[in-house]
Protein backbone atom coordinates (compact mmCIF):
# COMPACT_ATOMS: atom_id res chain seq x y z
CA UNK A 1 0.00 0.00 0.00
CA UNK A 2 1.17 3.54 -0.72
CA UNK A 3 2.44 5.47 2.26
CA UNK A 4 0.97 8.98 2.59
CA UNK A 5 4.47 10.49 2.22
CA UNK A 6 5.02 8.84 -1.14
CA UNK A 7 1.55 9.92 -2.21
CA UNK A 8 2.46 13.49 -1.26
CA UNK A 9 5.74 13.18 -3.17
CA UNK A 10 3.91 11.88 -6.24
CA UNK A 11 1.43 14.75 -6.03
CA UNK A 12 4.34 17.20 -5.74
CA UNK A 13 6.03 15.67 -8.82
CA UNK A 14 2.78 15.97 -10.72
CA UNK A 15 2.31 19.60 -9.60
CA UNK A 16 5.81 20.72 -10.57
CA UNK A 17 5.54 18.85 -13.91
CA UNK A 18 2.31 20.78 -14.58
CA UNK A 19 3.82 24.13 -13.56
CA UNK A 20 6.68 23.51 -15.96
CA UNK A 21 4.32 22.35 -18.72
CA UNK A 22 2.13 25.46 -18.42
CA UNK A 23 5.19 27.75 -18.47
CA UNK A 24 6.36 26.05 -21.69
CA UNK A 25 2.84 26.12 -23.16
CA UNK A 26 2.79 29.88 -22.57
CA UNK A 27 6.27 30.30 -24.10
CA UNK A 28 5.20 28.28 -27.16
CA UNK A 29 1.88 30.21 -27.31
CA UNK A 30 -0.18 27.01 -27.38
CA UNK A 31 -3.97 27.18 -27.50
CA UNK A 32 -5.89 25.33 -24.78
CA UNK A 33 -6.82 22.68 -27.38
CA UNK A 34 -3.18 22.17 -28.35
CA UNK A 35 -2.25 21.83 -24.67
CA UNK A 36 -4.98 19.20 -24.25
CA UNK A 37 -3.68 17.23 -27.22
CA UNK A 38 -0.06 17.32 -26.08
CA UNK A 39 -0.88 16.22 -22.52
CA UNK A 40 -3.82 14.01 -23.54
CA UNK A 41 -6.32 15.89 -21.40
CA UNK A 42 -9.97 15.37 -22.45
CA UNK A 43 -11.11 19.00 -22.69
CA UNK A 44 -10.13 22.65 -22.14
CA UNK A 45 -12.44 22.63 -19.08
CA UNK A 46 -10.40 19.82 -17.49
CA UNK A 47 -7.19 21.60 -18.56
CA UNK A 48 -8.35 24.70 -16.68
CA UNK A 49 -8.86 22.58 -13.56
CA UNK A 50 -5.28 21.34 -13.91
CA UNK A 51 -4.10 24.94 -14.22
CA UNK A 52 -5.94 25.79 -11.01
CA UNK A 53 -4.57 22.70 -9.26
CA UNK A 54 -8.04 21.16 -8.87
CA UNK A 55 -7.71 18.14 -11.15
CA UNK A 56 -6.55 14.61 -10.29
CA UNK A 57 -2.88 13.70 -10.46
CA UNK A 58 -1.38 13.21 -13.90
CA UNK A 59 -1.26 9.62 -15.11
CA UNK A 60 2.15 8.03 -15.74
CA UNK A 61 1.69 8.62 -19.48
CA UNK A 62 0.75 12.26 -18.95
CA UNK A 63 3.79 12.68 -16.71
CA UNK A 64 5.97 11.20 -19.45
CA UNK A 65 4.44 13.60 -21.99
CA UNK A 66 5.08 16.58 -19.68
CA UNK A 67 8.67 15.41 -19.05
CA UNK A 68 9.36 15.00 -22.79
CA UNK A 69 8.03 18.50 -23.49
CA UNK A 70 10.28 19.85 -20.71
CA UNK A 71 13.25 17.98 -22.26
CA UNK A 72 12.46 19.43 -25.69
CA UNK A 73 12.25 22.95 -24.25
CA UNK A 74 15.49 22.40 -22.30
CA UNK A 75 17.32 21.21 -25.45
CA UNK A 76 16.09 24.26 -27.36
CA UNK A 77 17.02 26.78 -24.65
CA UNK A 78 20.25 25.22 -23.33
CA UNK A 79 22.18 28.13 -24.86
CA UNK A 80 21.33 31.06 -22.60
CA UNK A 81 19.29 33.87 -24.11
CA UNK A 82 17.73 31.82 -26.89
CA UNK A 83 14.20 31.60 -25.50
CA UNK A 84 12.83 32.83 -28.85
CA UNK A 85 14.67 30.04 -30.64
CA UNK A 86 12.43 27.47 -28.94
CA UNK A 87 9.28 29.22 -30.15
CA UNK A 88 10.64 29.56 -33.69
CA UNK A 89 11.88 25.97 -33.84
CA UNK A 90 8.59 24.51 -32.62
CA UNK A 91 6.45 26.58 -35.02
CA UNK A 92 8.54 26.65 -38.22
CA UNK A 93 7.94 24.05 -40.94
CA UNK A 94 10.96 21.76 -41.37
CA UNK A 95 11.82 19.83 -44.51
CA UNK A 96 13.95 17.19 -42.77
CA UNK A 97 12.45 13.90 -41.63
CA UNK A 98 10.44 13.11 -39.59
CA UNK A 99 8.67 16.45 -40.19
CA UNK A 100 8.47 16.39 -44.00
CA UNK A 101 7.35 20.00 -44.33
CA UNK A 102 5.28 20.17 -41.13
CA UNK A 103 6.24 22.11 -38.02
CA UNK A 104 7.54 20.07 -35.07
CA UNK A 105 4.48 21.26 -33.12
CA UNK A 106 2.09 19.92 -35.76
CA UNK A 107 4.05 16.66 -35.91
CA UNK A 108 3.78 16.23 -32.12
CA UNK A 109 0.08 17.20 -32.04
CA UNK A 110 -0.78 14.74 -34.82
CA UNK A 111 1.35 11.80 -33.68
CA UNK A 112 1.21 11.95 -29.89
CA UNK A 113 3.60 10.20 -27.53
CA UNK A 114 5.79 8.45 -30.15
CA UNK A 115 6.35 11.85 -31.81
CA UNK A 116 7.21 13.53 -28.49
CA UNK A 117 9.78 10.79 -27.85
CA UNK A 118 11.19 11.13 -31.36
CA UNK A 119 11.54 14.93 -31.19
CA UNK A 120 13.18 14.75 -27.74
CA UNK A 121 15.67 12.14 -29.04
CA UNK A 122 16.35 14.13 -32.20
CA UNK A 123 17.21 17.27 -30.21
CA UNK A 124 19.50 15.37 -27.83
CA UNK A 125 21.34 13.93 -30.86
CA UNK A 126 21.64 17.38 -32.45
CA UNK A 127 23.10 18.88 -29.28
CA UNK A 128 25.79 16.21 -28.85
CA UNK A 129 29.26 17.47 -29.74
CA UNK A 130 30.37 16.23 -33.15
Region locations from a protein language model:
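Non-transmembrane "mature" sequence context
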Residues: 1-130
Amino acid sequence: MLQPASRRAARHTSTSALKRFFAIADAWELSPLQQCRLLKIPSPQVLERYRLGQAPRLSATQQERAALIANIQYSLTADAGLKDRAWAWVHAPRKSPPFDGDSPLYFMLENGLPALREVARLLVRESEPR
